[in-house]
UniProtKB/Swiss-Prot annotation:
One of its GO terms (biological process) is ribosomal small subunit biogenesis. GO terms for cellular component: cytoplasm. It comes from the Bacteria. InterPro entries: G_CP_dom, NA-bd_OB-fold, P-loop_NTPase, Ribosome_biogen_GTPase_RsgA, RsgA_GTPase_dom, RsgA_N. Binds 1 zinc ion per subunit. PANTHER family: SMALL RIBOSOMAL SUBUNIT BIOGENESIS GTPASE RSGA, SMALL RIBOSOMAL SUBUNIT BIOGENESIS GTPASE RSGA 1, MITOCHONDRIAL-RELATED. It comes from Geobacillus kaustophilus (strain HTA426). It is an enzyme of class 3 (hydrolase). Signal peptide: none annotated. Residues 63-223 form the CP-type G domain. This is Small ribosomal subunit biogenesis GTPase RsgA. Keywords: Cytoplasm, GTP-binding, Hydrolase, Metal-binding, Nucleotide-binding, Ribosome biogenesis, RNA-binding, rRNA-binding, Zinc. Gene3D superfamilies: Nucleic acid-binding proteins (2.40.50.140), P-loop containing nucleotide triphosphate hydrolases (3.40.50.300), Probable gtpase engc, domain 3 (1.10.40.50).
Length: 293
């Protein structure tokens, strides 16, 4: 018996990476009886029946599980947002950050196309970078053209399972191609356009990039907050957690409650006002959704 990780699932076969070799495996019938489906990203115990084939005996406990794309044990999300073309969207980034935080996945913010910045836009992006770093997020500025920031990104990918997410046209494929030129991913191959991945129906595969595994489909192709409860939302804004302990009321939603330490921190300029505005907008969105039964 050996241990490995599923890197591809296709036509009833599971391709397991183990010590640098890939085995084409079938799942045992017991999984069907238990209604358990092995997922890409699963850590498994398998029995090799030849140099290249085998069958899966056990599926390890999952750290997390994404539905779209169907993948397990994602350790980090590379959130790619371009500095320009399309313009940087802090609100969309905050939406992704909430979703990532809710899945207990470590976010890494990558700002691409920094080579295209000029004076005023350079200052604006620098302010955003400063704000998100101050909150505690890992932010990398990159350019697929000048190769700036690529070594730093490669270091983050090493030894981890990552998904890539972000707007359409931000350069996700270009960045992965720059890290591993033989991939030859076409622009648009990894695509999330405000929630609709171009190929969410095709198989998911983990690609070996920079010593780590990266999903070749967009992470979080559904951008709604359907799986998040309203009282959980403040926890997914790390700076709110820090100040929230000073609120008068336990379970403060930081909207209209008296003596709210978070709102006081916003007024004092200690929390970026745009982050708070996005939070208020998300609260309103969640209040409007239909109840789940």
């Amino acid at each position: 018996m050996a241990e490995g990780q599923i890197i591809k699932a296709l036509s009833g076969f599971y391709y397991v990476l183990s010590e640098g070799r890939v085995f084409q495996c079938r799942g045992r019938g017991v999984f069907r009886k238990k209604k358990v489906t092995p997922l890409v990203g699963d850590r498994v115990v398998f029995q090799a029946t030849s140099e290249t084939e085998g069958y899966i005996l056990e599926i390890g406990e999952r750290q997390n599980e994404l539905v779209r794309p169907p993948i397990a044990n994602v350790e980090q999300a590379i959130l790619v947002f371009s500095a320009v073309s399309p313009d940087f969207s802090a609100k969309l980034l905050d939406r992704f950050l909430v979703l990532v935080e809710s899945k207990r996945i470590t976010p890494i913010i990558v700002i691409s196309k920094i080579d295209l910045l000029d004076g005023e836009s350079k200052e604006e992006i620098a302010r955003y970078v400063h704000d998100y770093r101050r909150i505690g997020y890992d932010v990398i500025e990159t350019s697929a053209v000048t190769k700036g920031g690529l070594d730093e990104l490669a270091l983050r990918l090493r030894g981890r399972v990552s998904v890539v997410a972000g707007q359409s046209g931000v350069g996700k494929s270009s960045l992965l191609n720059a890290l591993r030129p033989d991939l030859r991913l076409k622009t648009g191959d990894i695509s999330t356009h405000l929630g609709r991945g171009k190929h969410t129906t095709r198989h998911v595969e983990l690609l070996e990039v920079a010593g780590g595994l990266v999903a070749d489909t967009p992470g979080f192709s559904a951008l709604e907050f359907n799986q998040i409860e309203l009282d959980e939302l403040p926890h997914y804004f790390p700076e709110f957690r820090t100040y929230g302990e000073g609120c008068k009321f336990r379970g403060c939603l930081h909207i209209a409650e008296p003596k709210c330490a978070v709102r006081e921190a916003v007024e004092a300029g200690e929390i970026p006002s745009y982050r708070y505005d996005h939070y208020v907008s998300f609260v309103a969105e969640m209040k409007e959704r239909k109840p789940r039964y």
